[in-house]
């Protein structure tokens, strides 16, 4: 640790005295990344050529795809159209919690709800569950 600190202190002072021999600022234009503008311009030009080459290749591929579609009468898939995956499913579409709640409330709209027998049905349900609990207490497998 002490050796590291000494090297840092002596190294910083030495570079100040020598003026940073490795760092030349005498007319060689450098950008903030430390590269010559010619190198940057060449890199940008190369990138543009690469992009143009890829654009041309993709256009050629699309022409080839379109030729195959025309030959075999295949329709092009639309990217913006959402696919309906429920068509080939074995089970039906899953219900959201909102749909389940709506079905529970639809019970009032059913025949029992229309006849006004909802209270009697609820009483019968509670009596049946109570009787079941009582009977279940007598049998050893119900515990």
From Swiss-Prot:
Q: Mind telling me which Gene3D superfamilies this protein's record contains? A: Single Helix bin (1.20.5.580)
What family does this belong to? Belongs to the complexin/synaphin family.
What residue ranges carry the coiled-coil annotation? 40-71
Q: What does this protein do?
A: Positively regulates a late step in synaptic vesicle exocytosis.
Which keywords label this protein? Coiled coil, Cytoplasm, Exocytosis, Neurotransmitter transport, Transport
Single GO molecular function? syntaxin binding
Q: Does the keyword Cytoplasm apply?
A: yes
InterPro entries listed in its UniProt record: Synaphin (IPR008849)
Q: Name one GO biological process term.
A: modulation of chemical synaptic transmission
Q: Per the record, what is one GO cellular component? A: SNARE complex
Location of the region described as Disordered in the Swiss-Prot/TrEMBL record: 16-72
Source domain of life is Eukaryota
Its recorded name reads Putative complexin-1
Where would you find this protein in the cell? Cytoplasm, Cytosol
Skewed-composition ranges (Basic and acidic residues): 23-33, 44-72
Please tell me the species this chain comes from.
Caenorhabditis elegans
């Amino acid at each position: 640790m002490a050796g590291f600190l000494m090297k840092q202190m002596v190294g910083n002072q030495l570079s100040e005295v020598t003026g940073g021999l490795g760092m030349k600022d005498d007319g060689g234009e450098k950008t903030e990344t430390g590269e010559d503008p010619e190198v940057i311009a060449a890199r940008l030009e190369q990138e543009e050529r690469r992009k143009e080459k890829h654009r041309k290749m993709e256009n050629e591929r699309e022409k080839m795809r379109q030729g195959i579609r025309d030959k075999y009468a295949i329709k092009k898939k639309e990217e913006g159209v959402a696919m309906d995956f429920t068509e080939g499913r074995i089970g039906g579409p899953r219900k959201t919690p909102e749909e389940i709640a709506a079905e529970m409330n639809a019970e009032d709209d059913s025949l029992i709800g229309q006849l006004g027998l909802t209270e009697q049905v609820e009483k019968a349900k509670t009596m049946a569950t109570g009787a079941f609990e009582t009977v279940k207490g007598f049998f050893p497998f119900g515990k």
